[in-house]
Amino acid sequence: MSFFGSEVARPRLFFRGLLGQAGPILITGGRAVADYREAFVGIDVAKLKNAIAVAESGRNGEVRYWGEVEASDAGIRRAIKQITAKFEHVYFCYEAGPTGYGLYRLIRSLGHECIVVAPSLIPRKPGDRVKTNRRDAISLARLLRAGELTAVWVPDEDHEAMRDLVRARTSAVETLRTHRQQVNAFMLKHGRIYPGKRSWTMRYLRWLQEQHFDHPAHQIALQEMVETVIAEFVPHWSLAAVVCALRALRGVDLIAAVTFATEVGDAGRFESPRQLMGYLGLVPGERSTGETTKRIGITKAGNSRVRTLLVECAWTYRYPPRIGKRKLYRLEEVSSSVREIAWKAQTRLTARYRMLSARGKKSTVVCTAVARELAGFMWAIAREARQTTS
């Protein structure tokens, strides 16, 4: 059996560099001469267009540049059909690279032989410093005919998918490690030492968010690095689904969603939204004596981090309800029930902001009132997300 999988009833000559496999080559006068009915095709692959060259069989066979075709299945099929119509046996090759093995599988599915070449093992002239798609395709075709190319092992689709998954995880871990090192170096440079024992826990991330610098540039740099680390950390967290669902709300970004999830925890421990509002200190206070009842400002009891963050989020509801492009992508990642709650929250809170502003209320009072109701919608979405994933 030849390297290309076809039986040829004639003498054999082993290809050099093709793993010791025999190729359909005639031995004539002590020289290797291919069958004249064969052709060897070199393809220089690229993102948009592939350059193709054809080497006819025989020591003196013509090696010509065939042209460029679109790097699509339809374009490749047309080119292969035109080339194979003139020869009995056609062999294809291209360099391994970022385009993967899709072209290899396409050529094999059409009934032709193909090898994926190891780029580091392609023979090159020491003084040849001109590299173009045309020259590379011609060189591949000529070397394939001469048997000077080394093929790489091509995995099947299942094996490739698993390998890509493992590589993606490894890359994500390396990226996360790099970002953590950058944050640690930044904090050490400015003399900020974490007092706890274990770093990179949720308590450590909260500590990072509480750090303040005198210079705005330092503050912005820290925030950017912390957000990057949190974005890498969240997908592996038990509350990842809750964070993703909360980001469907208008004004709630990554930091707001993560802060709410870390500080509140399981929203199911609150029997009603009003209990959560009280926990966050967003409900009005009261001073009553005898028959006199007096309402005062919010209690400001409980968790101040989430309360402050919700008031900041409430500012976005001063605009009319709409869904931006970035938020539209977020909505595609959540369930239909979460999308309904998010849209209901947007229509109600924008209307409430306008109504309170029309009554002459101060902007701080308006935002606090909107933040109180926003907490109720976040409670509903968090419970819905936990029920969906459980």
Curated annotation (Swiss-Prot):
InterPro entries in UniProt: Transp_IS110-like_N, Transpos_IS110, Transposase_20
Tree of life domain: Bacteria
Organism of provenance: Sinorhizobium fredii (strain NBRC 101917 / NGR234)
Protein name: Putative transposase y4qE
UniProt similarity note: Belongs to the transposase IS1111A/IS1328/IS1533 family.
This protein's UniProt keywords: DNA recombination, DNA-binding, Plasmid, Transposable element, Transposition
Xref: Pfam families: DEDD_Tnp_IS110, Transposase_20
Alphabetical GO biological process terms: DNA transposition
One annotated GO molecular function: transposase activity
